[in-house]
Amino acid sequence: MSRRHSAEKREINPDPKFGDLVVTKFMNAIMLHGKKSVAESIVYGAFDVVQGKTKQEPLGVFHSALDNVAPHVEVRSRRVGGATYQVPVDVRPERRQALAIRWLITAARKRNETTMVDRLSGELMDAANNRGSAVKKREDTHKMADANRAFSHYRW
């Protein structure tokens, strides 16, 4: 990491259908081997399935799923003397969003529906209703932070 200059954030364009930057970030995270059109069709296909099953606005379901998965605290390792402590720290908003996106996609990929569209739509609907593995991951992270609250004075 450079001490002199911090890396400047790159501008990303909002997605063509909804005009939402978060959806673009989500698409970029789903994309494999630079195949943006495939990622786009997966995300929009999943949104169509969500709209068909829930009769709600897919963007609203997506944002509520992200909010339900996003962690507020996490633990970080801190070495003090000879011991390593798991210190609970608050999560910055950018990292919170990135973790939520990453956990949603990982949970969707682990599901056992046949297509990625079905997996993603299922995970989005589950997360919007506070169910599913992505929400469980958030709960585990919060439990870990709660269990290590005694070490919160080692915060930096």
Curated annotation (Swiss-Prot):
It comes from the Bacteria. Gene3D superfamilies: Ribosomal protein S7 domain. Keywords: Ribonucleoprotein, Ribosomal protein, RNA-binding, rRNA-binding, tRNA-binding. GO terms for biological process: translation. The keyword tRNA-binding applies. GO terms for cellular component: small ribosomal subunit. GO terms for molecular function: rRNA binding; structural constituent of ribosome; tRNA binding. Belongs to the universal ribosomal protein uS7 family. NCBIfam families: rpsG_bact. Part of the 30S ribosomal subunit. Contacts proteins S9 and S11. HAMAP family: Ribosomal_uS7_B. One of the primary rRNA binding proteins, it binds directly to 16S rRNA where it nucleates assembly of the head domain of the 30S subunit. Is located at the subunit interface close to the decoding center, probably blocks exit of the E-site tRNA. This is Small ribosomal subunit protein uS7.
